[in-house]
From Swiss-Prot:
Cleaved signal peptide residues: 1-31
Cytoplasmic side, ranges: 168-499
UniProt keyword Transmembrane, yes or no: yes
Positions bearing carbohydrate: 14, 142
One MF annotation (Gene Ontology) recorded for this entry: ATP binding
Protein name: Probable inactive receptor-like protein kinase At3g56050
Amino acid sequence: MSNNWKSVRLRLQNRTLVFLLVILSFGSCYSLKSQGDGFLESVTKDLWSDIDAEDLRAVGFHRKLLGRFRNPYTHLNAFRDRPVARATPPSSSVSTRPDAKRSSTLPPPQKSPPAQHVSAPPPFVHHVTLPSLTSSSKTSSNSTIPIVAGCIAGAVFILLLATGVFFFKSKAGKSVNPWRTGLSGQLQKVFITGVPKLKRSEIEAACEDFSNVIGSCPIGTLFKGTLSSGVEIAVASVATASAKEWTNNIEMQFRKKIEMLSKINHKNFVNLLGYCEEEEPFTRILVFEYASNGTVFEHLHYKESEHLDWVMRLRIAMGIAYCLDHMHGLKPPIVHSNLLSSSVQLTEDYAVKIADFNFGYLKGPSETESSTNALIDTNISETTQEDNVHSFGLLLFELMTGKLPESVQKGDSIDTGLAVFLRGKTLREMVDPTIESFDEKIENIGEVIKSCIRADAKQRPIMKEVTGRLREITGLSPDDTIPKLSPLWWAELEVLSTA
């Protein structure tokens, strides 16, 4: 729950940051618009000042003419070129010197017959005084400062936005990194905030009231379910019927198992689709992909099962190797708790799907014989990467020979299997007789087997080295070993729609 809460809190913080950035952006735009309007008003005021109006009134223009000119300077040339009627002014007329001192009123004209003396207005062009450059520059400077400040604020905003996007994107990339293969984008988004939690009623309906039992697994009973879309799923139900038998330690191990399985995410692994936990009735369930072709153990040792030819076995071996190499390469590394041929399942096209249902059952010191054994994950904590390499060597021997690694009783004889191989018998001599033809490089595979099962764990190669060596022998790439149509791609959409 803590991981889910941290993820939700991070998403809320991201959205809050984006909201604040949007508000700041709109505020900056509105501020620039207001400053622009003020700048236009100041420019208009400078171009058409009160002094200009006084000059026009002084030369006799009527006040109503002022409204006709939005900008008088655009009409100067036209006004200057107009012909002016010349009449003889009286001897006492007003001086028309260009440098005459500006006055708010004109001297009173001399009394004379109006019909004989018509005074023409002095040339308006030469008497109009331009607005003060000092005042205009101050106004322009005052108007420019907010614009420059707005531009700087916008640049800082863009820089902060780019930095924030880069930071959160890189941080999100780190959390998504374990999921980058095998899953589609839809399911990745759900897994980032936790594994989908499903309802018991939905799982019960898919499993036909839990009547479709297909086997058992270390944690309990294994059911087959079918979603409403027709996609098949595997359901592992914990064999604990009462909450009294489910301690806090077991609950912690159960959640650790979910966390571990959800991080593997490989196309050659039985991926976890979801889980269910309910108290009434007490339920602890894990939902996985379903591989329809059974296990490798069944195909090797049951006569009624489909025969595996040489190419199939090489593909199975490489699929297991690639998956284990991926698990060991995670940070921190994840090891398989109990790698056996019975834990390797096959899809419809006989691609590998490694399952890991194992928790391990141990009886507590204070428990009675009738009580349910405590479920603790001891195998996972004790198993090492070297153990996985050893188990892979044994499994590879079983694939090539069709024999169990350990000695088993077969009728009146004992099949020692691996012991004979270690005593010097070649793998070619021990190859499964059901294989009609096989590659001449089988002895090279025998060398890989011997290196994996060395008694000294420190002398065993790491899984990456084993995988590289087998790839040189078989020539199979990771894409050659994965299912052509993974059940996960279909199951995930149905799970998401019901989660």
